Amino acid sequence: RDHLIRHRLHMRVELDSVDLYDDIEEFLRSGKVDLVSFMDHTPGQGQYRDLLLFGDTLKGYRDVTDEEVRDIVRMQQESSKMTYAQIAALASIARERGISIASHDDDSAEKLAFMDGLEASISEFPISLDVAREARARGLHTVAGAPNVMLGHSHSGNLSAREAVEAGAIDV
């Protein structure tokens, strides 16, 4: 049957979702996923390398004290993460099913190399111009967020999408 709209599902896998691993694996096998992103929002790296910025962002969403922010940071930094073998197994399922793989908040050449090993094809929200350029040099499609474009800057103090587009480092 013909449809006017074809919805596509982007599965965003947070690496500390260890307890959901079996569900993630099952959903990837279901045939309903078109794109999977592997994300790690642990404070102190990626989007939130700057812990002060993380704290300010958290305070913007929730009524928390500095002590509560420190506790949240510690808890997130100490939380279990999926192992490389688990991530690689999920990526393998994605590839077998023709699901595109994206990295998220790339902050270094090392992270890009890690994602190369998973055969990712998309770098979603690289956090610096150097990393965006490196991602493109590695053959990844680079993506910036619409709010970043509209605001003219990243809400978390990272790469400006406008700057990256002007530099030819962003594809979408």
Q: Where do the protein language model's features map onto the residues?
A:
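Active-site-adjacent C-terminal substructures of enzyme catalytic domains
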Residues: 9, 100-172
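Metal-coordinating catalytic core of metallo-dependent amide/deamination hydrolases
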Residues: 1-106, 147
